[in-house]
Each structure stands twice: as structure tokens, then as C-alpha cells.
Amino acid sequence: MERNPYPTDLTDAQWKLIEPFLPPPLPGGRPRKTDLREVLNALLYLVRSGCQWRMIPHEFPPWKTCYNYYRAWIDNGTWDELAASLRMDIRCQAGRHELPKVAAIDSQSVKTTEQGGEERGYDGGKKVSGRKRHLLVDSLGMLLAVLVTSAAVDDAHAAPELFARAESEAFPRLRTIYADQKYHNYDLYQWVEANTDYRLHIVNRPPQQRGFVLLPQRWVAERTFAWLGRSRRLSKDCEKLITTSEAMIKIAMLHVMVRRLATATPAPEFSYQAKLAA
């Protein structure tokens, strides 16, 4: 059915990047009638606009159909496989090795909605009741791993699980991880030394400096949160389940990556590249 396009619709070039990773129809049964491109368009509309599932426009496939594909692609690893391939393409496009050597870790506390759900708590430092998003990104700001916890969880206590998700098999070159003072924790240092090949580097603000300070080694992680902030679905954590909360972050990042690849516009370099060459 012909319809007027939405700003979030995939272009032909973007669709060509994604289509090979979508699972084929299961053998047997009647032929698939659902247009998977329209399913993805609906999911991108949902994440960018922040609407509820039942408020997905009627031009798209039924919301239950879209939700079922969304959950199926979480369970079978489609989102992760697609993100890994696009990330490597972006790194190669920028003249980098497809596997990172350097990463940055950071977190963001966000409010949850009144519907409740798993893993909610209070972040006393940020004065936020809800959940905390922990991200590990490469030197271009591309997502390597994501973990969602209660906002009450300390950043240093969540870091081991986040690092464990960045498996050595997936990132064998990864050695240096930049972090801020929240990760200056003796137990974390001990865990990293005993369980990984990483070197955790704490980036300190200049002496005598007060207020906000732009730290080049960590600015890349803040920029990734800014990219994600364009998606209204992420302005709060609207999900009941942690797995779906993490999936929404991956979809928002997926949209960033396909738009960058399809337009062939590499991410701008950030300062002190000699220290952060990856």
C-alpha cells in the first residue's frame, strides 16, 4: 500500500544495509505476507517519536505484529548481529581497524514511568528514581555493549558485567578503557586485572577546575548519550523489562549507524587522537 513517508523511514540505501541480516521465513506454513521493511520503519518511528505501541500509525503493519518481530529479533540475536556488522563498517569507513583498541565507559540515570517493571531504584547522586544505562563505546562513539540496571546500582559495581558483555572473542584488540572518577574503585581494579586484559584509565579533571570540564578522552561517551537523546522513547525508560529497555537503546543506535553509512559521513574526530588511536 502506498503511503506518505515519515522522516524515520529507511531509504533504499539504508534498507540494503539491513536486509541481509533479517532471518528468512521459517520452513513450512503459509508464505510471509508482512513487509519487514515496514516493520523496521514502524520500530524506528516508535523509538524516535516516543509513541506507545498501540499508537503506531495504521499505515504500518499491526502493532502486535511489529512487537512480535521486535521480541523475536531480541531473542535470536538479530539486533546484536546487525549492530556488530554496521559498527565494523563505520570503523572501516573512517579509516580505522574494524575492531577497537580503545573504549570509554559511562552511565546515565533516567526516570521510569508509572507502570513499574524490573530493576528500579534511586540514584542519590543524580536525584533520579528509575534506571541507569551503562554504555561502553569505541573511539568513534559506536556502541560496544549496553547494560541497564536499577539507578541505585553503583557504576563501579555494574562495570564488571558490562565488561563481560564485551567478550574477548568479539573484541580481541580491546586494551584501554577510559572512565571518570565514578569508576575509581579498588575492587573494580582488582576484578579487571584478574579477569580481563584491559587497562582501566581514570580521566581526572584539571586541578583547581570547577564546574563542567570537557575531557577529550571521555567526550566521546557523552556524545553517544546525546545521539541517543534524540530518540524520545529514551527520554524516560518506558519498558517493563530490562531486555526490552536495552533493545530500545540498540535500535536508536542502529538508526544512527545506518544513516551515517548510507550518507557516507564519518563521525568527526575528537581531540588527542595520538592517545586514542584505535
Regions found by a protein language model. Name each.
Residues M1-A278:
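Short alpha-helical elements
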